[in-house]
Amino acid sequence: MSRRNDGSDNLTCSFCGKSQDEVKKLIAGPTVYICDECIELCNDIIAEESKLEEAMGPDVKKLPKPREIKDVLDEYVIGQDQAKKVLAVAVYNHYKRIESMGKPSDVEMQKSNILLLGPTGSGKTLLAQTLARILKVPFAMADATNLTEAGYVGEDVENIILNLLQAADYDVERAQKGIIYIDEIDKIARKSDSPSITRDVSGEGVQQALLKIIEGTVASVPPKGGRKHPQQEFLKVDTTNILFICGGAFAGLDSIIQQRIGVKKLGFGADVKSKVEKRAGELLTEVTPEDLLKFGFIPEFIGRLPVLATLRELDETAMVQILKEPKNALIKQYQKLFEMEHVKLKFTDGSLVAISREALKRKTGARGLRSILENAMLDIMYEIPSQTMVKEVVINEDVIYNKEKPIIVYENVAESA
């Protein structure tokens, strides 16, 4: 009972029995009471259970199906449908594999690490980041160009695991089911086809070092980063269930593929395929492990990245879509900023085409879009907060091409800023 019969009307907690005089707060419900201490205890229990669920990794029963994963990727990444399908299936199978590991089976399922091939700015990093967000797992990024094998100036491969551990708030269990994206992986290719007797500090040696953590090992991670030393305590992280996604532009790989598939005959009826016949992005879709071997990767490293996904180079149409369609589209972000100033921001179709063409000239893919917009919008974003009666700002192609000022529409008058 919530009211103790002790000759007084003193109320008590229905859970711990403490009276209202012994606690800070007593909250009443239908025929029951609960004190602030019991509420705090319940919160702690729920928080602990939530942490345990997160540590267990994504529940396969709640895990989005491949089609659902692709649908969410579509909201953030324009085009690249085939790559999205490959990623969705690989990620889904990866976490199904983790769930099956605790069950008796006569089949051993291999890890589905992924290799993403595609030009700069085609969406490789964004795809990996979005996957981690969908699955609610820790995510870390690393740049392969900074890595060297142990004992040389540079970053140890174990520091990649440290980044993931930090993303998981040093929860080792959660980190062990996270995703690591290694960018610029093509930069650690061997410098020549034949093994060298000299040390290849940032090439084959790094491949060998990465090989261990990608295939699964218990890594000793220095909690504060940096180089290892004997007096330092290490955190032990099992990388067996960490999904590794490696990405790179692989400049020159298209030539290797072209040499392999190109048919050359002499004399009449010669059937010669020109290198310009296919775009580099199309050629990359025909990549084989043998091509990667010739590019400079060791066979063991290629074998640990069994899933290949190719991203195509973005064209003008795709660039325009990227500007306005995704959930986090740049145009939507700028419009939201202006909306906070009670001003409508409009981009003409011509301005979107102009931004896209300027970005294509830079050959940095979608990465160039933001800097172009920042330069075009700087002055107007500086002025608008100080101006009154502004109703609308219109950005046309002249703002992009000729650095002209945007059109400002006031409450009753239209004039140039």
From Swiss-Prot:
Residues 1-54 form the ClpX-type ZB domain. Keywords: ATP-binding, Chaperone, Metal-binding, Nucleotide-binding, Zinc. One of its GO terms (molecular function) is protein dimerization activity. It holds the Pfam family AAA_2. InterPro entries: AAA+_ATPase, ATP-dep_Clp_protease_ClpX, ATPase_AAA_core, Clp_ATPase_C, Clp_protease_ATP-bd_su_ClpX, ClpX_bact, P-loop_NTPase, Znf_CppX_C4. It comes from the Bacteria. SMART domains: AAA (SM00382), ClpB_D2-small (SM01086), zf-C4_ClpX (SM00994). CDD domains: RecA-like_ClpX. Zn(2+) binds at residues 13, 16, 35, 38. ATP binds at residues 119-126. GO terms for biological process: cell division; proteolysis involved in protein catabolic process. ATP-dependent specificity component of the Clp protease. It directs the protease to specific substrates. Can perform chaperone functions in the absence of ClpP. Component of the ClpX-ClpP complex. Forms a hexameric ring that, in the presence of ATP, binds to fourteen ClpP subunits assembled into a disk-like structure with a central cavity, resembling the structure of eukaryotic proteasomes. This is ATP-dependent Clp protease ATP-binding subunit ClpX.
